[in-house]
Structures are given as C-alpha cells and as structure tokens.
C-alpha cells in the first residue's frame, strides 16, 4: 500500500478549499482517505495565517511511517521546516543562443 500526503479538493464551484489528507495512492483524489492533517485555502492572501493549517506532529509521524508528500504538499512542508524539498532540474531552454542574441542586437541597432 503506497501512502501519500496530498490535497483533496473541497468547497464550491470557483471557490476551492483543499484538505491535506493521507490516502492510499489508488484512492480517488477527493474520495476515501486515512486521516485529515489540515486544510489550505488558496483564496486567502499569502500572509494570512489561516491560509494553511497543518497538524505538524501528525505530518511528521506519517512521513516517518513512509508516506510520500505530493509536490505541492512537499512545498508546504519545506516552508514549514518539516522536510527539505529537492531542487528541481530547470534547464535553461528559453535562453537565446549566442547567434540569436547577436542577431537580435544587430536588429535593434538598425
């Protein structure tokens, strides 16, 4: 049984609220879960304390048991200082090459 800590959507249409839950990875996103660990309201300002509420003791216990957090939850846990999130590989594909950069500069001078 692969256990994950993830967000389950709640709320109404166009007014989402998410519950931070521990669930089997095979369960539906908004379906059955093992335990609710907190909630997240993305509509509140980022500096508002009520935007994210987590029971950090329960989160630490589930991580110790082997539960894998989703990407978004891992970001929350990194901000809370519970666990360290790995740096992602972001290649610089959008950076123009030297030839294109030189051509763009030449076109700008005309």
Swiss-Prot record:
Keywords (A to Z) from UniProt: Ribonucleoprotein, Ribosomal protein
GO CC annotations on file: cytoplasm; small ribosomal subunit
InterPro entries the UniProt entry points to: Ribosomal_bS16 (IPR000307), Ribosomal_bS16_dom_sf (IPR023803)
Ribonucleoprotein recorded as keyword: yes
Molecular function (Gene Ontology), one example: structural constituent of ribosome
Gene3D superfamilies linked to this entry: 3.30.1320.10
Region annotation (Disordered) ranges: 87-110
Pfam families cross-referenced by the UniProt entry: Ribosomal_S16
Domain of life: Bacteria
GO biological process, alphabetically ordered: translation
Entries under HAMAP family matching the protein: Ribosomal_bS16
Similarity field: Belongs to the bacterial ribosomal protein bS16 family.
Name of the protein in its database record: Small ribosomal subunit protein bS16
Protein source organism: Rhodopseudomonas palustris (strain BisA53)
Lineage: Bacteria, Pseudomonadati, Pseudomonadota, Alphaproteobacteria, Hyphomicrobiales
